[in-house]
Design a protein with these regions (language model features):
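Short edge beta-strands and adjacent turn/loop segments
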Residues: 37, 45-79
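Bacterial N-terminal signal peptides that target proteins for export
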Residues: 1-8
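Short, flexible loop/turn elements at secondary-structure junctions
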Residues: 2, 76-78, 126
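Bacterial N-terminal signal peptides
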Residues: 9-17
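Solvent-exposed, acidic/flexible segments
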Residues: 29, 33-36, 65, 78-89
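Polar/charged, Gly/Pro-rich intrinsically disordered segments
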Residues: 105-183
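Short, non-transmembrane amphipathic alpha-helical segments
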Residues: 40-43, 82-111
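N-terminal presequence-like segments and adjacent domain-start helices
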Residues: 19-44
Length: 183
């Protein structure tokens, strides 16, 4: 490239980066984003304390300002049995659903009211006391996504891929937890 072409490329880069930055500056956060941030913060603090775990992620699905999904991810010391994991996941999902459905300010922005387990995602990433990953035969991740509870294993031979996933419907898991608490 000659000097003129290099100069033109540099000038174009500055012009284009200026356009992109001006677009970013024009973004206005929707009103409901503040409500959702408060909801996620309050729920996560409550669940952290109740289940002795640490929040490591949050998520909001809000295409065109319509709230379709709320997510929380936690790190917890394990291993956990399926029964223990199920009870925690069900408790987390129920807390999120109740908190969202009680909040009248957010209702007009919800895709559906009442909010259900299909609108909530909860993930528990399990670690040893030393902070290491947990491998099969114990669960490494327990999650609730789209109304299903998943129990995932990783093998130490292939730690980047889940070697086994067990699944149950959230409603079934909820009934099992409720029946267990009646005993």
């Amino acid at each position: 490239m000659n000097k003129i072409q290099v100069s033109i490329c540099i000038i174009l880069m500055f012009i284009l980066s200026g356009c992109v930055l001006s677009l970013l500056d024009s973004y206005e956060e929707p009103e409901q984003a503040k409500f959702l941030g408060d909801i996620l913060n309050n729920v996560s603090k409550k669940l952290q304390k109740k289940y002795t775990m640490r929040t490591i992620g949050t998520g909001i699905g809000m295409p065109d300002g319509v709230v379709t999904m709320l997510a929380l991810s936690f790190e917890k010391t394990g291993p956990l049995t399926q029964e223990e994991g199920r009870a925690i996941i069900v408790g987390c999902v129920e807390e999120m659903i109740q908190t969202v459905n009680k909040n009248e300010k957010i209702r007009p922005y919800l895709e559906n009211y009442p909010f259900t387990s299909n609108n909530v995602e909860i993930r528990l990433f399990l670690k040893t006391k030393e902070g290491n990953k947990i491998y099969e035969p114990d669960y490494g991740v327990i999650s609730e996504i789209d109304g299903s509870v998943n129990y995932k294993y990783k093998s130490s031979e292939n730690p980047k891929k889940y070697s086994k996933i067990e699944e149950e419907k959230f409603e079934e898991a909820l009934k099992m937890v409720q029946n267990k608490s009646k005993k």
